[in-house]
Each structure stands twice: as structure tokens, then as C-alpha cells.
Amino acid sequence: MALFGSSAPAAAAPANSAEDVQQTKANLIAQLQQEMAMANAKKLISKVNQNCFENCITAPGSSLSASESTCLSSCMEKYIQFWNAASKAYIARATTQTVAANAMATEL
């Protein structure tokens, strides 16, 4: 009796080559990285909108004053610069930890 009560014999699953497995793994990693980048961009935009609007727009109206526009531009630039610096530091630390972990694994 085959899988799930079928009377037909179960077919053998095709063996995946090491190249297929590596390609699938690389594709999955790339997709996850892209999704994480998109989530981070959405989070950045949300934070910029929330904080800069609260700090720069004192009296919402039909248009922005020159000072509000300048404040928003400055605020957004600061947030983006900070975000980039934090991201670079995080990536550098993660890379260092990955290299150290790989070195320890090869020693064993």
C-alpha cells in the first residue's frame, strides 16, 4: 500500500544534485535579503514620517510654510544618514561574527 492509502506504488523522489540545492539556497537567501531590505525601507519611511511630521509641522494646513519645508528636509536627511550609518555598522558586525564563527567551525 502506498502513501496515504493509494494503491499505486510511491514514486521515488528525484535526487537533487548539490548544484540544485546550492542554487535553491542562494535564491532563497537573495529573496529573504530583498524582503528584509523592503521591510527596513518601510520602517525607515514610517519613522521619518512620524517623527519629522511631529517635530516640524506645528499647525497643519493646506500647504507647508518655508520653515516647515526646510525642517522636514533637514529632518529626513538626518534620519537617512543615521539609518545608513547604523546599517553599515550592523552589517560590519554581522560579517565579523560570521567570519569568526566560520573560522571556529573549520578549526573543529
UniProtKB/Swiss-Prot annotation:
Domains: entry comment: The twin CX3C motif contains 4 conserved Cys residues that form 2 disulfide bonds in the mitochondrial intermembrane space. However, during the transit of TIM13 from cytoplasm into mitochondrion, the Cys residues probably coordinate zinc, thereby preventing folding and allowing its transfer across mitochondrial outer membrane.
Thylakoid in keyword set: no
A cellular component term, taken from the record's GO annotations: mitochondrial inner membrane
GO BP annotations listed: protein insertion into mitochondrial inner membrane
Motif (Twin CX3C motif): 52-75
Residues spanning the signal sequence: none
Family indicated by similarity: Belongs to the small Tim family.
Function: Mitochondrial intermembrane chaperone that participates in the import and insertion of some multi-pass transmembrane proteins into the mitochondrial inner membrane. Also required for the transfer of beta-barrel precursors from the TOM complex to the sorting and assembly machinery (SAM complex) of the outer membrane. Acts as a chaperone-like protein that protects the hydrophobic precursors from aggregation and guide them through the mitochondrial intermembrane space.
Source species of the chain: Emericella nidulans (strain FGSC A4 / ATCC 38163 / CBS 112.46 / NRRL 194 / M139)
UniProt-recorded name of the protein: Mitochondrial import inner membrane translocase subunit tim13
Localization (cell): Mitochondrion inner membrane
Assembly behavior: Heterohexamer; composed of 3 copies of TIM8 and 3 copies of TIM13, named soluble 70 kDa complex. Associates with the TIM22 complex, whose core is composed of TIM22 and TIM54. Interacts with the transmembrane regions of multi-pass transmembrane proteins in transit.
Disulphide-bridged cysteine pairs: C52-C75, C56-C71
InterPro entries: Tim10-like (IPR004217), Tim10-like_dom_sf (IPR035427)
Topology versus the membrane: Peripheral membrane protein
Keywords on record: Chaperone, Disulfide bond, Membrane, Metal-binding, Mitochondrion, Mitochondrion inner membrane, Protein transport, Translocation, Transport, Zinc
GO MF: metal ion binding; protein transporter activity
